[in-house]
Amino acid sequence: MAIPITVLDCDLLLYGRGHRTLDRFKLDDVTDEYLMSMYGFPRQFIYFLVELLGASLSRPTQRSRAISPETQILAALGFYTSGSFQTRMGDAIGISQASMSRCVANVTEALVERASQFIHFPVDEAAVQSLKDEFYGLAGMPGVIGVADCIHVAIKAPNAEDLSYVNRKGLHSLNCLVVCDIRGALMTVETSWPGSLQDCAVLQRSSLTSQFETGMPKDSWLLGDSSFFLRSWLLTPLPIPETAAEYRYNRAHSATHSVIERTLQTLCCRFRCLDGSKGALQYSPEKCSHIILACCVLHNISLDHGMDVWSSPVPGPIDQPPEGEDEHMESLDLEADRIRQELILTHFS
């Protein structure tokens, strides 16, 4: 059960004691356009978050006034979507930057506690078949129930001695594994892997591998790019296609896998704290991991509320560390190779 958290107002000396909860900012006092421009989400979505997280963000206190759940959520959304603790953001809702930082921490933890509620694979056969049908309708790739990729998110250096977070560009990052469906809804998110790990190593160590190797629906698989090794449950493109059927397979694979690429671009465009445009996340790796996951939870909640995942303008490919030559090598999984060749022969010849 989530433990309710109270954020005490750091500006108490400026405003004195009085009512137990501070409500300097009222949603009803501003326009929908203002909320979208400042916080990135519409009014009804924010009201839903207040209802969802309110119990975790509030608790009666006799000692001082607590910042309301509504204000805490606005502070967090402002940070997630802008990537910085701007003075104007705190001024808009009437709190200091120090209070904003605490609000972000508490809202982040409240969202992380609910991650499994909003990020998960479907379990019933009808839902799995629906995934297959939708992906097949996109580019003719059969049996696909999700598309996988990794994305690096820049973080500050944990300490001078720890090189595990240094990626191939010489920058500190977390390498995050993500799987989505055709709508861009996230079904698996792992955000704690250090940036020095290659994508194939992240996948090997992930819970996703144990989940799919212990059991998955028959004739079902994920699609991954050439940074992953071919597996019996994860199909990759052919490094050197030779026949017409192999070229058709690669084209269908690329068109289908582009869903996760667009989803990650949109995620970083909506949540600018992830794209590095305002600098690396200035927290410990664990807190950075939680912030990334919180943004992913918000992404899925927004889809559940009818917001279009593709509505945000996407500037272009995400700047990521280069792939190593070894990442284009095929694995020696003979069973996986047999499955892929059989698929090509059956569906693309």
UniProtKB/Swiss-Prot annotation:
Its main location: nucleus. InterPro entries: HARBI1-like (IPR045249), HARBI1_animal (IPR026103), HARBI1_dom (IPR027806). Coiled coil: none annotated. It comes from the Eukaryota. It is an enzyme of class 3 (hydrolase). One of its GO terms (molecular function) is nuclease activity. Its cofactor is a divalent metal cation. Belongs to the HARBI1 family. The keyword Nucleus applies. Its EC number is 3.1.-.-. GO terms for cellular component: centriolar satellite; cytosol; nucleus; plasma membrane. Interacts with NAIF1. It comes from Mus musculus. Disulfide bonds: none annotated. This is Putative nuclease HARBI1.
